[in-house]
Curated annotation (Swiss-Prot):
Pfam family, one: Homeodomain
Iron listed as a keyword: no
Top-level taxonomy: Eukaryota, Metazoa, Chordata, Craniata, Vertebrata
Composition bias type Low complexity, residue spans: 153-163, 199-215
Protein name according to UniProt: Paired mesoderm homeobox protein 2A
Amino acid sequence: MDYSYLNSYDSCVAAMEASAYGDFGACSQPGGFQYSPLRPAFPAAGPPCPALGSSNCALGALRDHQPAPYSAVPYKFFPEPSGLHEKRKQRRIRTTFTSAQLKELERVFAETHYPDIYTREELALKIDLTEARVQVWFQNRRAKFRKQERAASAKGAAGAAGAKKGEARCSSEDDDSKESTCSPTPDSTASLPPPPAPGLASPRLSPSPLPVALGSGPGPGPGPQPLKGALWAGVAGGGGGGPGAGAAELLKAWQPAESGPGPFSGVLSSFHRKPGPALKTNLF
């Protein structure tokens, strides 16, 4: 059997299916195309496809409406290896300055930190450099100068803060020294001389009640009794210590001047009597 008519029918159906969706190449943006599920009607004026023979179907017209591949891709979308090589070549070479060039640059920088274009060009011709190199050097030199100024100001502020702390410490030490001089310390009280012995100090203070005791009454009876008691107590106390110098000093202090004629001559003359045996034994 001959099945050639089946092949011709399949080719015609494929052609009708492709023409039903319209032309996609005419749209500038593929996302803006809206799909319509309704198929448009076939043109009535066009000749229908014959049932047999696939040579009469206009399949060549469909190829004219198809877009060319990669039509939306821009020019040189994919980078070439030569572009990366050019970027690597654009790296700046570090400039090395000689001592003579640095000397001239520093001299101009001492005069002005911002030289104009004419000064830079003249300096570049003088030291055999380009004007761009001279300009970059001045930019770096100004940055270095500002950094040095900031470091110097920070160091000065730290020194001033240290000086203020030292002054505050000295003032506190001065206040402490003033307080220590005003209030006695335990060591200063220890260096004071010891108080005199009670036996030696009492005879020096005991002659003060003499006029009171003597002026209380004209009679020589009970007046000098307290004096004698104090005298014997002082002699006895002094005998317990050093009997040599202490007793001699005590007797010398109690020896009165020569008494003249008066109401108390009898009383005072009693002190000139020689000490008895009891006193001698206590003193020596």
